[in-house]
Each structure stands twice: as C-alpha cells, then as structure tokens.
Design a protein with these regions (language model features):
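N-terminal secretory signal peptides that target proteins for export/translocation
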Residues: 1-16
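N-terminal leader/targeting signatures
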Residues: 13-14, 26, 35
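Aromatic (phenylalanine/tyrosine) cluster motif
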Residues: 17-18, 30, 39
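Bacterial N-terminal signal peptides
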Residues: 21-32
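Catalytic cores of phosphodiester-bond hydrolases, prominently lipid phosphodiesterases
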Residues: 34, 41-49, 54, 58, ...
C-alpha cells in the first residue's frame, strides 16, 4: 500500500470547496498587501489599518473617523481659491443641479480604514463627505433577504445598506446646504432599497425629477429639503424619486488600465440624456493608490474635465474617481466649478441688465 504523508493526506480529505477558498484568501492577502503599500511618490497621507467590524456588517465606536480638520493633517489639495467643498463656491445656490461638476467616489463603501479587501477608497463614507465628495457609487446586493453593500463578494467586505444610509443621513442633517447623489449598481429589489432609505430617514429628502423637466436650482432643492438624488441601474421608476440612471445619464467607459486610454467615448446611456458620468479611474487588475495618483494628477484630470464639454457637448456632471485624496481631484473640480459658475453668474447678470434696459425703453 502506498504511504501517504500527513500533508498530502490532509489535502486528499479536504473538500474542494474548502481548498479553493483557502487559496483565494492567500492570494487576496498577498495582493492586498502589495496594493496598499505606501509609495513615496503618491503624496497621500496613509492611515493605520485597524481591525474594523464595519466591513463585516457591523458599526462600532472604534470605526469612528476624524475629519481632516480634527486631525490637523489635511493634505487633500484644495482649489486655487482654497475651496474644497462646492457649497463654499460663490454662486453655488444659484447654479442648477446639472451645472455643477460633482466629485463622485467609485465603490465608495469599499475603503481601507474599515478593513475592506481590494478597496477603491482609503476613508469611510463620512470622511469622504467631509472632504468634499458629493456623489457615491454603491453596489447593492441581497444577503439572507437583506440589502447589503459589497463589491464582487462578501468575503472582501460588506455593510448593511441601512447602516451606510444612516451615516449619510447624519451628515446631511449636520450640513443643510449639501446636495448629494447616490448612483446604485443594484441587485436588490426596489422595495428593499426603499425600505432601507425609509428606515434611515432619507425617503423624505429625495428629489424627484421628470426626465422632460429642467433640473432645479440648488437653492430650491435646499429650501424644499429635497437634497438627495438617487439613480439606479435596476428598478428605476418603480417609485417616486428612484430614478433610472440610464434614462437620465450617459457615461464614458470604466474599464481603463492606463492614462493614455482615457477617452470620451460613450459606453452606456442615450446621447441625449441630460447628465454625464465621466469615469476617471484606472484598474490593473484592481484599484491602487499609485494608479489613482496618476489619474488624479491635475495634468491629467484638469484637461479631461475641461475638454469634456467640447468633446461630448455635455457638461461633466459626475467625475468618478478612486482614492480621491491622491492627486488633485478636489482642486481640479473646485477650479473648474468656480470658472463655470462665474461664467453663469455673469451671463445671468447680463441677461437681467438687458431686461432692465428693455423695460426702460
């Protein structure tokens, strides 16, 4: 009889379904370490990776993050005006929702400080919002009959949708002039998403938009406290305020490996749609800070934002990035918005002046 050594014997009796996940875990752990190594040229603050229960669907006091102002270590690049958040821009309230370029985080829930594997962001939702992010791309899945946020597999991290939405509600309550957009990749029934929004207290804050109507001014959304716009790729239109993303938006391609491959070529959505999603992140084969630093550098991001309208005849409404604190995302958007809102303000003043002159005649 052939003698089997302990190691092969163990391998021979392990079920295949067990051996494969073990190999996957080893591979994931190796890549995770590699992707989260801090590179000197990325110019971004690193944070200690703590053991977090959020990535496993729980939220504890240990997961609380400090804002940049609390830490005194805010190295997120600001615009030339020193403005980080769009609310601080002159003319913000008089601009319409579709004439502001909003910074959006790709796979916003997947972040390093809360222990997610293969993260697309460094910080959690609250920190992102405090830093000036105003749009969140979230993947919604069902686990045991409940709506969760996860990306790819729950092994990489997960959090109940309601938990994330409650975090968003808390921020919006503290900042009454903030407009926020959620863009959902949704594998959950629309009823489950509605249930989570209602439990989090956000349902009453949702703006409803008819596709044939012009988007409202920011000031009107603030006065009516309808400051949350929700777009989804599944179940849109099933209830008021739950918008079909491809009825309102078009997007550029999102599978890009190097800066040279960035284009304005349309991927999904009708060309006539009113909102434009400018996907601006690199994946090779997963997201990483060095890749983000290249994509988010002002020499790359600024001309891409500014060239969007001339290339596509569409305003870059949602600029979607990984690791937003790498590079110059906030500075680039602040400078672009300041120029654009300034032009709109001058145009409005000129129109009022012409109207007044006509009345005098």
């Amino acid at each position: 009889m052939r003698k089997i050594t302990p190691a092969p014997r163990l391998a021979s009796i392990l079920p295949r379904f067990f051996r494969v996940p073990v190999s996957l875990v080893v591979l994931v752990a190796f890549v995770q370490v590699a992707m989260n190594t801090e590179f000197a040229d990325s110019q971004v603050i690193d944070v200690p990776k703590e053991s977090s229960s959020v990535a496993n669907g729980k939220n504890t006091a240990a997961d609380t993050e400090k804002s940049p102002t609390q830490t005194g270590k805010d190295q997120v690049a600001l615009g030339g005006s020193g403005v980080r958040c769009p609310e601080k821009l002159p003319g913000y309230r008089q601009a319409t929702y579709d004439r502001i370029a909003w910074l959006v985080t790709h796979n916003a829930m997947s972040n390093r400080v809360e222990g997610w594997w293969f993260p697309n962001q460094t910080y959690g939702i609250t920190r992102q919002l405090e830093d000036g992010v105003r749009g969140l791309m979230l993947d919604v899945h069902m686990i045991d009959g409940e709506a969760f946020l996860l990306h790819g597999s729950s092994i990489f991290g997960k959090v109940p949708l309601e938990t994330c939405l409650a975090e968003i509600k808390a921020f919006m309550q503290q900042h009454s002039d903030v407009i926020l957009t959620l863009i959902l990749e949704c594998y959950a029934p629309a009823t489950k998403v509605r249930e989570s929004l209602e439990k989090a207290g956000l349902l009453s804050m949702m703006h409803h938009q008819d596709s044939a109507d012009a988007w409202p001014k920011v000031n009107d959304m603030i006065k009516e406290d309808k400051r949350l716009v929700v777009l989804t790729d599944a179940g849109g239109g099933e209830w008021r305020g739950y918008h079909d993303v491809w009825e309102f938006c078009q997007e550029t391609h999102y599978s890009v490996k190097q800066v040279a491959d960035f284009t304005y070529k349309r991927n999904r959505g009708n060309q006539a749609n009113s909102l434009f999603i400018l996907n601006h992140f690199l994946t090779r084969p997963v997201a990483g800070k060095v890749l983000a630093a290249r994509a988010n550098d002002s020499s790359v991001l600024q001309p891409r934002i500014e060239g969007c309208q001339s290339a596509t005849m569409r305003f870059p409404n949602f600029v979607v990035v990984d690791f937003y604190e790498c590079g110059d995302t906030l500075a680039s958007l602040a400078d672009f918005n300041q120029k654009w809102i300034g032009k709109q303000k001058q145009k409005s003043q000129h129109s009022r002046h012409e109207s007044a002159s006509a009345l005098e005649k």
